[in-house]
């Protein structure tokens, strides 16, 4: 009651207070989403470290089906072993499941989305969508890697200075990290002024999952085998990023119309330029 009359409760609201409350709520939800992404990745890593081939058929079976389709080879499942080729020369086992790539892709997509849209608010639906996209990308990348490995085995290919295990490791690094970069570029909008800097993000995620976690787990106690793996993983992805950054830089230098700094922020979508998306209401 004001001055003997009634005033609607909504007439006394404070826009500044409402904005602060809304921002605080948005930060809490963003923090919960970040924690969920990290916990999902850790849970999957723990599950994979103890899983058998029987427990990984959800990813081994579709991968093997795609490999059979593309390579013409046939495989049969053997309990607790994996999918054995008909000539018993190749097995798609637990280490071939691609779960580490799945974790890396999920982290890269999830963390990048959270960071990029941290001021706008993100619907929780981005989590299952990110997981589904990472799963599909894993099937494609893993199928490609296994088909290449089968072809290397069939042709008995050798590289001077590399053992069979080293060649297999190099092939896996190039295929997996190459697909990670491709996935990043297909899902990312990069500012025209900093397209090469953005490529450091997938590299950092890849290093964290392939080098950081093994170091924390004490894998370095294995001695020389671990440090050989460490050097391969450290050097070759960096080389791939440097090559891609060179070509991206060359493409931008060859297209001066992409330099739009004087016209405000724009985004670079696979060679196309558009204005940034309008801010979305929080959902």
For the regions a protein language model found, what residue spans apply to each?
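Acidic/polar hotspots within intrinsically disordered regions
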Residues: 4, 11-13
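Hydrophobic N-terminal alpha-helices or hydrophobic patches in metabolic proteins across all domains
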Residues: 14, 18-283
């Amino acid at each position: 009651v004001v001055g003997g009359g009634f005033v609607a409760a909504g007439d006394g609201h404070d826009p500044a207070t409402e904005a602060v409350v809304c921002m605080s709520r948005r930060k809490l939800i963003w923090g919960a989403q970040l924690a969920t992404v990290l916990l999902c990745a850790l849970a999957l890593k723990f599950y994979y470290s103890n899983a058998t081939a029987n427990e990984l058929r959800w990813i081994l079976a579709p991968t093997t089906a795609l490999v059979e389709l593309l390579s013409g080879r046939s495989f049969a499942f053997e309990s607790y072993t994996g999918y054995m080729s008909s000539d018993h020369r190749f097995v798609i086992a637990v280490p071939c499941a691609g779960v580490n790539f799945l974790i890396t892709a999920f982290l890269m997509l999830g963390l990048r989305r959270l960071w990029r849209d941290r001021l706008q608010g993100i619907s929780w639906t981005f989590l299952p969508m990110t997981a589904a996209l990472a799963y599909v990308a894993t099937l494609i990348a893993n199928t490609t890697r296994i088909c290449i490995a089968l072809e290397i085995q069939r042709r008995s290919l050798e590289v001077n200075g590399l053992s069979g295990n080293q060649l297999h490791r190099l092939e896996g690094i190039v295929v997996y990290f190459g697909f990670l970069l491709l996935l990043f570029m297909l899902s990312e909008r990069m500012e025209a002024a900093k397209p090469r800097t953005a490529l450091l993000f997938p590299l950092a995620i890849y290093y964290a999952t392939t080098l950081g976690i093994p170091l924390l787990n004490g894998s370095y106690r294995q001695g020389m085998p671990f440090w050989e793996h460490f050097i391969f993983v450290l050097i070759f992805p960096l080389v791939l990023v440097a090559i891609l950054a060179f070509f991206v830089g060359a493409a931008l230098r060859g297209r001066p119309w992409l330099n739009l700094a004087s016209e405000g922020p724009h985004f670079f979508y696979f060679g196309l330029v558009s204005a940034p998306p309008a801010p979305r209401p929080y959902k």
